[in-house]
Amino acid sequence: DVKRLIDVIQKLRRNLSARAPVFNKALDDRVEKTRFIKPAGVIICEGWFWGAIPEPRSALINPANRLEEEQDHLGIWRSWVNDQIARYKEAFVSDISIYLRAPSLIASREWRKLQEEENLAKNGEDKSNIRLDIEKFLAHFERLVRWIDKELSGRANIEIVLDEYHDIARIEQR
């Protein structure tokens, strides 16, 4: 709900209180209750694709992986995703941006797998197919992850590079 996100952020920037949806990671969806947020001197927003900008159209021509090659050979899905990212532009306006950079796509996959295993364990669900499910899930976002890693790492005010154990390897300030 991009419009709602922008509304909440704008209210907080104007020093007004706002009601924001609550996201349940284990359910991968919002829950019915909302959270009351009071104005604060600093607003921190985070997310897997926070700060992303659309890729140039020319970059969308060739598939990024096997999933795109087999299921999006015409580029309809990747073009649609690119158009959706453009809708977030107003929400992503900030005074400072910090990019947490994973050491590799492989590390991101492993971290996501661990996160999903924890979520499944909380819900008492079977974890036997998690690796295959994660690989399939992440294939949908591989292009965007690679683009952000290339583009945002050069644009963020601060880049925090993590090692494979989630420790800070280095911090770069621009």
How would you label these PLM feature ranges?
Residues 1-28, 42:
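Conserved nucleotide-sensing/catalytic segment adjacent to the nucleotide-binding pocket
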Residues 23-29, 78-83:
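Short gly/ser/thr-rich secondary-structure transition/capping motifs
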Residues 33-37:
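Glycine-rich phosphate/ribose-binding loops and adjacent secondary-structure elements
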Residues 39-40, 93:
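Alpha-helix C-terminal capping/helix-to-coil transition sites in glycosyltransferase folds
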Residues 40-42, 64:
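Glycine- and acidic-residue-rich phosphate-binding/metal-coordinating active-site segment common to enzymes
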Residues 43-49:
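Switch II (G3) loop of P-loop NTPases
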Residues 49-174:
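Conserved NTP phosphate-binding and transfer environment spanning the P-loop NTPase/kinase superfamily
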